[in-house]
Regions:
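Intrinsically disordered, low-complexity acidic/Ser/Thr/Pro-rich linker and tail segments
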Residues: 1-123, 170-181, 222-238, 424-438
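Hydrophobic beta-strand positions that form the internal "hydrophobic ladder"
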Residues: 104-105, 143, 201, 258, ...
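A short beta-strand motif characteristic of beta-propeller blades
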Residues: 81-87, 123-130, 161-165, 175-183, ...
């Protein structure tokens, strides 16, 4: 019997498993899932040492681009073989952005972790000094750059500063005359979204959701009414929880609408003067995510229960005065995706692309028609898309960032139903001296 080299074993196992999964999905959709047996995961643990040695060799400075591509062909990317290593090395990546020059920004670590902001380009990975968190306005013009001193807003990445904003004190919007404590440290942003005029920033954090402006911060969540109710019930100020779970937010590209939510609220929509205009009951237990479509005339709202969820859509024209309850059957808030707990998402012409708890990127139309799915693995933690809608970047809790060329054809090793090909991935793993490109 001929002895195969490790890369041959890896390549054959990865491609065979991807094809088996894709066939399984195709059969299930065509014929139903009854009596279908899921493909067996191939044994690849014994190949990990050889894979790591080859990966390290492909990242040496003297390795040519041709050699790197040959490595990728011999050792095609896959999630399942890496599972034994993830408990030790995997970590969340809380934010990614595609810059106009094709480079990437990534914040390694989740919001509550110290983390590090890095810039990734074809030449390597470089720390971004003096920036601890970042965000970009929905019109793609302004960037918010945060550190312990406050938030700078710049016109373009590396462009001139147009605004400098202070972090909230933590006392904003709380009833006067009670001994509430200010923040000891600035909130750790879950999201930092400049408004399209560059003058204000939506700060979403586990310590509260605020709008930062030159004249101070305005608290949006938790709402003062909730605090007043707790005080009226006799709860001591120090016992009132001001923290949020599953906090999220979005700003429309024209700046007219602000969407916020958290585990204990409905989906809340405010106008540009921060007046409440809509309260939309979620399609599952806990509001979890919000996203506007590319045209800005539809809003996507996801809620979750455990690792599943339901996603509603609502026309922006229907927002003023809209009030619906949990699990409402209101025709103005149709269900457009059933099943996904959405952690990240982007929109392009006529299509939403969301990242779910099971490591899938799922695309569907504004009418809810399913388009395709693409498997990355772990849980998707952050996403961005290029202005032309042709390049997608997705990050996961496995410490992986992947760049995907949309509509470019699907390689044989890719699990998915869409014609999309990953062109590069990076592993930002705990315990490694440096990130490695795959």
């Amino acid at each position: 019997m001929d002895k195969q080299y490790p890369q041959q074993q890896w390549q054959q196992a990865v491609i065979a498993y991807a094809q088996a999964v894709n066939d399984y999905v195709a059969q299930g959709r065509a014929q139903g899932w009854d009596n279908l047996q899921a493909p067996q995961v191939p044994a690849t643990d014994h190949l990990l040492d050889a894979w790591l040695a080859a990966l390290q060799a492909a990242n040496r400075p003297d390795c040519s681009e041709q050699q790197r591509q040959a490595f990728r062909q011999a050792w095609p990317p896959a999630h399942q073989p890496l599972v034994p290593l993830l408990d030790e090395h995997g970590q969340g990546i809380s934010n990614v952005l595609l810059l106009g020059d094709g480079s990437l920004l990534a914040r390694i670590g989740m919001p509550h972790e110290k983390g590090q902001v890095l810039r990734i380009d074809r030449h390597g990975v470089t720390p971004v000094i003096g920036v601890e968190c970042f965000g970009r306005c929905p019109a793609r013009r302004y960037f918010a750059l945060g550190n312990a001193e406050g938030v700078r807003v710049t016109a373009g990445w590396g462009g001139p500063q147009v605004q400098r904003l202070a972090w909230p004190t933590g006392l904003e919007g709380l009833p006067a005359g009670y001994p509430f404590e200010p923040f000891d440290l600035p909130p750790a942003p879950t999201a930092l979204i400049p408004f399209p005029d560059g003058q204000r920033v939506l700060l979403v954090s586990a310590d509260g959701t605020f709008v930062l402006a030159s004249d101070g911060a305005t608290r949006l969540l938790p709402h003062q009414a909730r605090v007043l109710d707790a005080l009226a019930e006799g709860t001591e100020p120090e016992d009132i929880s001001l923290g949020l779970s599953m906090e999220h937010g979005a700003v429309s590209a024209d700046g007219r609408w602000v969407v916020v939510g958290e585990q204990g609220s409905r989906h809340l929509v405010l106008d540009d003067r921060l007046r409440l205009v809509a309260e939309i009951g979620p399609g599952s237990e806990y509001p979890h995510f919000a996203l506007f479509n590319q045209r800005g005339d539809q809003l996507l709202l996801n809620a979750c229960h455990f690792y599943s969820g339901a996603t509603l859509a609502v026309r922006v024209a229907d927002l003023p005065g809209l009030r619906t309850d949990y699990y409402s059957q209101d025709p103005r808030t149709p269900l457009v995706q059933d099943g996904a707990r959405v952690y990240a998402g982007v929109a392009r012409a006529g299509e939403y692309i969301i990242g779910d708890a099971y490591g899938y990127l799922r695309a569907f139309g504004e009418d809810g028609q399913e388009h395709w799915q693409h498997y990355l693995g772990s849980t998707i933690s952050a996403m961005d898309i290029s202005a032309d809608g042709r390049t997608l970047v997705a990050a996961s809790y496995a410490g992986i960032v992947a760049e995907i060329a949309l509509d470019s054809g699907r390689p044989a090793w890719q699990i998915g139903t869409g014609a999309h090909g990953e062109v590069r991935r990076w592993l930002f793993w705990k315990g490694w001296d440096k990130p490695l490109a795959w």
